[in-house]
Every structure is written in structure tokens, then in C-alpha cells.
Amino acid sequence: MVTKDSIIRDLERENVGPEFGEFLNTLQTDLNSEKPPIEQVKSQLETHFNLAHETQEFSRKNDNAPVDKLLTNYYNNYEVNVLEFVLQMGFSRDLSIPLNVWFVLDMISQLSTSKQDLPLDYYLVLNNSQTGKYSDFVRYLIYEAVGAEIHCFEQGSMPEQYRSSRWEDKVKGPALANRGPIRGNVGAGDRKITFHLLCKKTARMILVGDDRETDFEMSDRSFVTLLLDYYQRVGTTKKIDLLLLTNNFDTNMNNKLQQLKILESLNMLKSNCYVLDYQITVDQVTANFNSYVEGIPAFRRHEIANFLKKRKTPKNADELIFKYVGRWNICYQKKFHQGNISIHQISGYLD
């Protein structure tokens, strides 16, 4: 774990403003206090950075809607009934780093109290190039607030880092210890980061994503290795809901289908399947261009649907799409159906 002094030195070197170092120097948490550490950190963040004023401005720009509702809608783009929660922080240019951190702590606090009977896993993804210099600052605050270290994987090394030992990380300290492991990664990528494979002992859903532009491609070998590792942990009788996301149906999807067929032949895949073809970019021009050049060829759609025809699309599939693309500006969207199979094709951009 990085130290407070090393973070302050790095912040000074990056010339990001003295208030961040000043905050770390004044931050105090008392484990004997009636107020949980997470609330202590939130309160000090709010005071030191005058977040009350910022939230008021944020509310004013959004028709005076309650800030807690706005923030929830803004960030909580993964909300399904599985034992897994992803807090994806696409740091907004409208919000400061401290307010983003405050909200993540608030979300962790809410999830922990509302799901007391569940072992929760948290994945924190910082997906904006502007936040790289603040990564250690964020990790340190979360460590102080919840007693768990957030792990940092450098851009391009994600597939190699997903090894079985990764799922054995334990919470350091008593905070939220009864909630189960709290793990996370702080990526060094930019706003084009999409989704990555998240699998663990308790989850009912596995997400597979590729984004070649940021070198976060999950290789076929890694994909199969992790699925096998997952089944070894939970047993082959456990039902999995598989949400398969890819941004390249023509080539990569074909490889994934081959691997799924292998797993199915081994009787290791007893899941519902849902397919989303996404093409997300950071500007409207590229997104509009992708609307024309990207597409799922008819023969590929038939192959996918034929492979998946015995599986049922999750009832909340459309809801999942809404959650995932809620912050995207959609330029093109098309939906294909064949039996119970639902294939979404989306092109858009992040503002």
C-alpha cells in the first residue's frame, strides 16, 4: 500500500494543487468513534473541499433534482440481482475528484448496509485519463474508510493479472469484514475503457469485454482459463448467467464462440446467454462512422443465434442494456431476435 507521504510527494510533483496534500495531512479516522470510518472520511472530504457548494451547483444544472438521485443515476450503471457490484467512476468534467470519491464511499456504505446478508465484492474502475495522477489518492482514502486495499493494474496488464490468487485477497482491518472480501482495481486507462471479465466465487454473472484501443483485450486463453478456474471453485452444477460483451463480432466473437462450444461439450456451461455488440468511442464523428462500417453480418448473427438458441435471454436484458448505456450518446442501435436470443448492436460516444 502506498504511504501518505509518497502520495503527497507525487501530487506535488504532478502540480495538482496543494489542497489534496493538505487534506491527507489533516485526515483523521478514529476506530473507537461511534461514527464509522467511512462516514468520518466522507464528512472530512465534504468540509475540506466545500462539496456542499459543488453539489448545489450540480443540482442546479440538472433542474434542481436531488443530488443523491442524480449521482445514483449518473454512476450506478450496474444494478442487477447478483452478488456483485461494480462502481464504475467515469470521472465527469462536471464533478471534482473529491466529490467523485465522496460518492463512491457513499455507494459502498449504502450497498454494505442494504445487503447485510450478502458477501459484497467491489470493483472500482477509474476510467478517465485525467484521474491517473489521483489514483493513489483515491486508493488511500478508500483504504482509510473501509479497511481494504484497492489494487492497481496498469494498462495493458489486465489479462495476466487475473489469476486465481487474485480472488483470495482479504480485507485488511475490521471495517466491513463481515461483508466478505472487498477487492478492486484502479485502471490506468482512459474513458474508452469498457468492461472486463469479473468472476469470483459468489457471482452468478460473468462479464467478458474487449477494448483493443486500450489494450484491455481478454485473450481466448485467459477467457477459458478463468472460466475453468471459476467452475473449479463453485462446482459445475452452479448456474451461471453469462453476459457476453464484445466489440468485434467478426473475429473475436468467433473465437469466443469456439471456446464456449468447448466448455459446453465438457458440460461446464449451464447458463443463460445474452449478447451485446458494442462500439463505443469518445467522439460523435467516430461513432457516426462506426454506425456505417460496423455491423453483424447476417451469417454471423445466424451462427450466434443458432449456438444460443437453447438458452434463454435474462428477463432483465433490456434493463441491463439501459444500465450500461445510460451515460452514452447513442448514434445507432439495432436489435436482432431469433427465438429467445437477443442481440443488441450499439454505437455511441461518451460526452
Swiss-Prot record:
The keyword Cytoplasm applies. It is found in: Cytoplasm. The keyword Amino-acid biosynthesis does not apply. Pathway: Carbohydrate degradation; glycolysis; D-glyceraldehyde 3-phosphate and glycerone phosphate from D-glucose: step 3/4. Its main location: cytoplasm. Keywords: Cytoplasm, Glycolysis. Structural subunit of pyrophosphate--fructose 6-phosphate 1-phosphotransferase. Not required for catalytic activity. Fine-tunes allosteric regulation of the ATP-PFK by ATP, fructose 2,6-bisphosphate and AMP. This subunit is only found in some Pichia species. Heterododecamer of 4 alpha, 4 beta and 4 gamma chains. The gamma chain bridges the N-terminal halves of the alpha and beta subunits. This is ATP-dependent 6-phosphofructokinase subunit gamma.
